Amino acid sequence: MNSLKKLSLVAISFVLAMASADGAERSIKINRQYLNFPVSHSLERKAMTFTVDGRKESRSVIRLAEGAADYWTFRDVSQLRGKTIKITYEGSQKALDNIVLADSIMGGSMIYHESSRPQYHFTTRRGWINDPNGLIFYRGKYHMFYQHNPYERDWENMHWGHTVSTDLIHWDEQQLALHPDEIGTMFSGTAVIDYSNTSGFGRGKDNPAFVVFYTADSPSAQRQCMAYSLDEGRTFTKYEGNPIIDSHEKWQSHDTRDPKVLWYAPGKHWSMVLNERDGHSIYTSSNLKDWTYQSHLTGLWECPELFELPVEGNPSERKWVMWGASGTYMVGDFDGKVFTPITPKQQNLIGSAYAAQTFSNIPQSDGRVIKMAWSRLGFGDAPFNGLMLLPQEQVLVRTHFGGWQLLSRPARETESIFTLAEQG
């Protein structure tokens, strides 16, 4: 409480709070790094809207505490330094006034020291996480985006969080990558590097566009969108032509989501795998903006993946693997437009693992297919929820019955966190 009083006094010089006919309202001049939000689960969620320099930026719901907080969440606003944020809140002015602008995270000294905090698996500092998104290796760093509610430990307000690593074990959490907008909240997707500048977003050979694809979810529909970065994934600009695919009417379904995009070299085009209604569809594009429907395969569900692997022990034999979020997969052939399964559905994930995705853009000199999956474990009253399982390498083997099976092995990087114990 003493810290809250001290920081509130500091904030007086640049904060204007006022009553509004539509609820509480407060304008804050950003000259510190973090907005801190007190959360109380005894309260109902209320809508909170951010407007930056007169432009509506995003809308979320939050349980802002009027008194003592169960815990604090935060938003890094350093990219908005010098700008003014207007926060409109459908709850009380008293709760809104408890938001603290500071150069530190409230309760930050306890982060990673909580009694329930996993030490070897990635967890976010505060809030909820689920599906890994946009896994990609670029210029020496593994980027992992993820489904994230930064304002509460429970699911809601889907943003894209962002973390980076040089070794797949030690992760450095970044600023939020994508915020909800007028099209919807930010559901799952993927990332590519547009080396040939097919989209026109790039700025020369040395600065290709880092492009992410995501689903914008709203009560009326799920639509596919994209954004691009020219600073190696630190900030993103949403494509002004979004959405790039709106197929909910065609399928008469709200379940049209989770784009996975890859470059299909033999055809010199982009391919997208998209969950639509009862299975996975394939779309193609020459420029990442305009997409043409090609085919559909039933039997798999959300968070689609599609990648090629050599058969272990016979590198000249290569097959494609398509899977869904629950870990069911098929092995088959892919011509850039149609995936033809040659095996029945099999199971790769078990237990709490869900929505695994593989890293794109792994150097050919490495050659591995590395996946990360979300674990649906909860942590009770902790101020965070959800974790990512350790990375695994995917291997395709021939079975004794003449078929193919996908195996998962701990990535070699995990050896650094294990110690072999001698047995007497």
Regions found by a protein language model. Give the residues of each.
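Bacterial N-terminal signal peptides that target proteins for export
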Residues: M1-S8
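Beta-rich carbohydrate-recognition and catalytic domains
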Residues: A24-P259, W263-G351, D366, M372-G424
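Compositionally biased, low-structure terminal segments
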Residues: M1, F14-V15, S360
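Structural secondary-structure packing elements that flank or coincide with functional cores
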Residues: N361-S365
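Catalytic and ligand-binding motifs that coordinate phosphates/metal ions
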Residues: S352-S360
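Short amphipathic alpha-helical "recognition" segments used for binding
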Residues: L9-V10, I244
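Hydrophobic h-region of N-terminal signal peptides that target proteins for export
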Residues: I12-A21
